[in-house]
Design a protein with these regions (language model features):
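Multi-pass membrane proteins that catalyze or facilitate reactions on polyprenyl-/lipid-phosphate substrates
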Residues: 169-193, 310, 324-326, 336-340, ...
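DPxDG-like acidic metal-binding loop motif
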Residues: 207-211, 222-296, 303
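N-terminal assembly/interaction segments in proteins that build large macromolecular machines
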Residues: 123-225
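Residue-level signal for inorganic ion chemistry
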Residues: 106, 110, 138, 149, ...
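Oxyanion/phosphate-interacting regions
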Residues: 2-107, 115, 275-295, 314-325, ...
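Short polybasic amphipathic segments
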Residues: 307-313
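N-terminal capping segment at the start of a domain
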Residues: 104, 108-132
Length: 467
């Protein structure tokens, strides 16, 4: 679903790909300077091969969207190569436009931080109360996305529920950590014009970064609208150099209305999902991707009622984001036979019962080995058609959080799939930060028929399980 324009003024004429139109633009010039100097100074010898994407300007089916006005936060670049999006403007168009740009920026930030974690040290890693890891990227992404949403939509109009808080960063002995987060945020925001967003007039200070993080204090609920953000979903995968995701969803009156899922390490070749991402990095270094190839990394997005989900590559190198950034539609698989299906489950046994899902897989005739993937990348795999089933049955006492599922659920649904609890009921995002009333676990499938077969098998197997 190529993103569409929230507004178009009619003052300055332009010719776009043979199509005459008019628009008022605000041009923002990007200055020079290093990006992520905090890390680049100590990692100058570590080359990171990232595929870049060349736009096929001769492809008449590509449509580029302009969102511009005299007071717009967006940038219109290279207008001679742009034509209008074919998608009709609709509800939540502006919000989706901003959300995708914000997630693109967040993924760009994460790639830099992950490279430094893999290359040098884990000193940037902290532990939360539940012993799950949290990194500079978690806080930096949360601050960056919070700042972007507040600046573009107005702070009074933005409520965010998110995973991280400022308790650790606010401690007296965390001055070095806070300084690193502030620098990472500012380095990222300085690149905002490349993503079609306005950079801050001056660098943010520590208090402003802490405020942006702490602004994510919504408690959710059944009324009004709020954003659900998981800045780095699958932090363990992130620090291990494997799969992780940046997830952002808008929830209105208890219903998810748009979702954006950034998957920086998602390989474009399905078979690579079966390998730890370090093998992918090794191969990329041995045979670097060409400028025409799209090797890894994507953002998948949708909005409620569109009946479609779209995927675009991450922008690489020093390229600028130009809508729709070679976006392509994604659809779930048509496989209905469990014997032919690929089954996803969490990597960590602490997050889900592998023994129950293994027994269930055997009972329905699943022949393939389960695909164990960190984070909401599992939702992306189903939406893309690379897998057909995702089941998660948490151990007793564990409560699912809405930011771990909201974006992935709507993306699968609009791509043609089905997501419910084990009782066949839709997931309820109206009860605050947790998915309250969840019947046993979560089942996501590529289609209704396959979903029905799996839920029946769960019912048949549940009583014999010690879960």
């Amino acid at each position: 679903m190529p993103l569409n324009c929230s507004s178009l003024a009619t003052k300055v004429p332009h010719t776009l790909g043979g199509l005459k139109t008019t628009a008022t633009t605000t041009t923002i010039h990007v200055g020079g300077g290093g990006f992520f100097n905090l890390f680049s100074k100590t990692h100058q010898n570590n080359s990171l091969y990232i595929a870049s994407l060349s736009l096929n300007k001769r492809n008449s089916s590509q449509r580029y969207c302009l969102s511009s006005s005299s007071s717009s936060s967006f940038v219109m670049e290279d207008t001679k190569d742009m034509v209008f999006s074919t998608l009709e403007p609709g509800k939540y168009s502006k919000e989706l436009d901003i959300a995708v740009r914000a997630v693109q920026m967040a993924c760009f930030l994460c790639q830099k931080v992950q490279e430094s974690l893999i290359s040098k040290t884990t000193s940037q890693l902290q532990a939360k109360d539940d012993n799950s890891p949290v990194t500079i990227a978690d806080w930096s992404v949360q601050a960056t996305v919070s700042w972007i949403l507040s600046e573009t939509l107005g702070s009074r109009n933005v409520a965010i529920i998110a995973e991280e808080d400022v308790q650790t960063l606010s401690k007296a002995d965390s001055a070095g950590l806070l300084e690193a987060v502030v620098q990472t945020v500012n380095d990222c925001l300085a690149e905002a014009p490349r993503f079609g967003l306005k950079a801050p007039g001056t660098s943010l200070g520590s208090s402003e970064v802490l405020e942006a993080i702490s602004r994510c204090n919504s408690t959710g609920g059944p009324n009004g609208r709020f954003w659900a953000l998981d800045p780095v979903d699958g932090t363990l995968g992130f620090v291990r150099g494997d799969q992780y995701a940046v997830a952002l969803a808008l929830i209105e009156d208890g219903e998810v209305v748009l979702g954006v899922l950034g998957c920086p390490n998602y390989p474009m070749r399905k078979e690579w999902l079966s390998y730890h991402h370090r093998y992918h990095r090794i191969i990329s270094k041995l045979t670097p991707p060409t400028s025409e190839s799209w090797d890894k990394g994507c953002v998948i997005y949708t909005r409620r009622g569109s009946g479609e989900a779209w995927m675009q590559p991450l922008i690489q190198g020093h390229k600028k984001l130009v809508w729709p950034n070679s976006a392509t539609p994604v659809k779930v698989s048509t496989i209905e036979n469990p014997a032919l299906a690929t089954f996803c489950e969490p990597v960590e046994k602490a997050n889900s019962s592998h023994s129950f899902t293994a027994g269930l897989a055997h009972s329905v005739g699943l022949r393939k080995q389960p695909l164990r993937v960190y984070s909401m990348v599992k939702y992306a795999a189903i939406a893309r058609g690379d897998a057909e089933i995702f089941m998660k049955f948490a151990r007793a006492g564990y409560k699912e959080k809405i930011w771990d599922h909201a974006a992935g659920v709507i993306i699968i649904q609009e791509a043609g799939g089905v997501v419910t609890d084990a009782g066949g009921r839709p997931l309820d995002f109206s009860k605050g930060m947790y998915l309250e009333g969840l019947d046993r676990g979560i089942i996501a499938c590529a289609g209704a028929k396959l979903h029905e077969k799996i839920t029946r098998a769960v019912d048949a197997s549940w009583n014999s399980s010690s879960l």
